[in-house]
């Protein structure tokens, strides 16, 4: 299954707020109490929707998400928490969480177009896995600097999570540590995602 490129509002209307996909908030349709009571949601659908939240928020394909689940299963610790850490430490997500891009698709475009440096080296792979003490900077070109400055001004209200620091004057970010569960920028039940893939991973 390829990466989603359709209307983003339709997705958040179904799954709720997904800050990585879009900064818009969904306008939910009002339903009568009788309609809500009559609509029983299956356990499969609940797990499926949690999985879809992860996939659309981080902008990854079904195959990529399944691979991350398989890696998380082999690692020490809680599979769900390791899965979230793997996704959060992707370069495109780090660029987004630092406020250098308004969304993860926007961050992925910056990385693909070679605007972003990791430890002073250009990295154009959005899935690149960042690690503690990595520094994230912008290419010293007028176009690159202008894009990031505009994005920072747009995203300045967003709080940088505890595992990252960002110097807006130097346009430099730093990965301090692997993030903890509380720093995840998404309302998600990762255990349901692991359960969804229990027969596939």
UniProtKB/Swiss-Prot annotation:
Transmembrane segments: none annotated. One of its GO terms (cellular component) is chloroplast. One of its GO terms (biological process) is ribosomal small subunit biogenesis. It is found in: Plastid, Chloroplast. Its main location: plastid. It comes from the Eukaryota. Keywords: Chloroplast, Plastid, Ribonucleoprotein, Ribosomal protein, RNA-binding, rRNA-binding. One of its GO terms (molecular function) is rRNA binding. The keyword Transcription regulation does not apply. Residues 89-150 form the S4 RNA-binding domain. Pfam families: Ribosomal_S4, S4. InterPro entries: Ribosomal_uS4, Ribosomal_uS4_bac-type, Ribosomal_uS4_CS, Ribosomal_uS4_N, S4_RNA-bd, S4_RNA-bd_sf. One of the primary rRNA binding proteins, it binds directly to 16S rRNA where it nucleates assembly of the body of the 30S subunit. With S5 and S12 plays an important role in translational accuracy. HAMAP family: Ribosomal_uS4_B. PANTHER family: 30S 40S RIBOSOMAL PROTEIN, SMALL RIBOSOMAL SUBUNIT PROTEIN US4M. Part of the 30S ribosomal subunit. Contacts protein S5. The interaction surface between S4 and S5 is involved in control of translational fidelity. Belongs to the universal ribosomal protein uS4 family. This is Small ribosomal subunit protein uS4c. It comes from Funaria hygrometrica. The lineage of its organism: Eukaryota, Viridiplantae, Streptophyta, Embryophyta, Bryophyta. The gene is rps4.
